[in-house]
Amino acid sequence: MTIFRFITRRLFRPRTEARSLVLGLWTAAVFSGGFSIGFGGGFGGVAFAQSLNFGGGASDLPIEIYADDGIEWQQENLVFLSRGNARAVRGEVTVFGDELRAYYRENPDGSTDIWRLDAYGKVRIKTAQETAYGKKAIYQIDKGVMVLSGGRVRLVTATDEIFADRQIEYWENKWMAVARGNALAVRKKKRLHADVLAAYFRVDKQGKNKLYRIDAFDRVKIVTDTDTVTSDRAVYNVESGIATLTGSVKLVRGKNVLRGCSAEINLNEGVSKLYSCPATAAGAGKRARGVLRPKRKEQKKVQPIAGPKVQK
């Protein structure tokens, strides 16, 4: 096994925000800062909904790269290749892949910048509390965009799981993560389905990144222990537990079916409110409607009392 160890060197003022929000932020604080060309370059880490700050003093931590089949430095192509059960470790963050690639550029002042990072094969991005799985990961550092794709992409945290058939993206400057293609978010027995899920984060009073809102687009479906609700779009307030659904809303509970233009579902308390369509210039809006089927108690069948047997 080849081991490659180096220390990154920062060439610009460190960022003070906790920028590593979701889905594999492969540390811009490390790679935008460059590396010592004599020792090579490497990979940083990722974190999902973690308060990891790669822009502070942790930027001086060494990055260690391991590869069973060796590490290749292609100077003409300005890229480092790590092959064979490759992994990159920095602090509590590890990137695994069959192959890891770090693309760099040379600046006029002689410094170097890593501008793109790729991972291929059995990609796994692991932090202390989260693990993301896919077959391909690309982080474009200049744009602040990371894309994890390949098969059924999956992200697992202590409380949640997120799946997507197409890809999961992280937009660093927007503090936003997007899951595309038959996306699914699972927490305990609650499930949120949609073609696209967009998750938004912000820093709480403790300085940690916290998920506060999820937007769901197209073929939205929320499933709980008692209800199944479908709509065209939904906005879920994570802190209050309230989901607001709009467009062709349908709520099913047992044999009861309710329909309307919008609905408010409190996922914490199990309370649902359905609303009719507002009136327009063309006329009155559509009313909310429903079919309720009350449960009836099943009557116990009375068994006939057997009389004495008559002997013939």
Describe the predicted segments one by one.
Residues 1-12, 18-312:
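Mature-chain termini and adjacent capping regions
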